[in-house]
């Protein structure tokens, strides 16, 4: 049986975007994120972070610094009862033309393979058009967060639409 997941961008989705964040003290999850992640966990979704982190390729911070910043975010989410199950990141600069920087799909394909995911049962949540394009290319449903649509709102949509699709699998919107 294939598994379902919510893939989620990091910056401006789970936490404010601190450009090239290299200090864990600068990492602060949005207030609604820990409880919202827990709701996804409780509903049986894996929660996988997929994030472009070109600061590594630009030499602004190291892999160790990125890991420390991500560990701080995960600690804050865990303190609120939520769990990020895995992190996939692209360390390359845009001009490197790699195959993992969103909207290219390598990070998503790695997640699908590693966890045996069914993309039709998965969601991508992010704040940029490239996040939405990434999810669409993988065959996932998508939710774009913004100043008007919080991560908690996105989770409301996912849980509501998942319940609807279980009752009527042919009634499926792709983007919210």
Predicted regions: what they are:
Residues 1-48:
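Active-site neighborhood of HAD-like aspartate-dependent phosphohydrolases
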Residues 2, 6, 64-85, 93-124, ...:
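Asp-based, Mg2+/Mn2+-dependent phosphohydrolase catalytic module
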Residues 7-8, 25-29, 45, 61, ...:
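Broad hydrophobic/π-residue packing in well-ordered secondary structure
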Residues 11-31, 56-65, 80-82, 92-99:
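Metal-dependent phosphoesterase signature
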Residues 13, 51, 142:
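Ser/Thr-centric signal marking residues that sit
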Residues 33, 37-70, 86-93, 135:
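Substrate-recognition element of Asp-dependent hydrolases with the DxDx(T/V) motif
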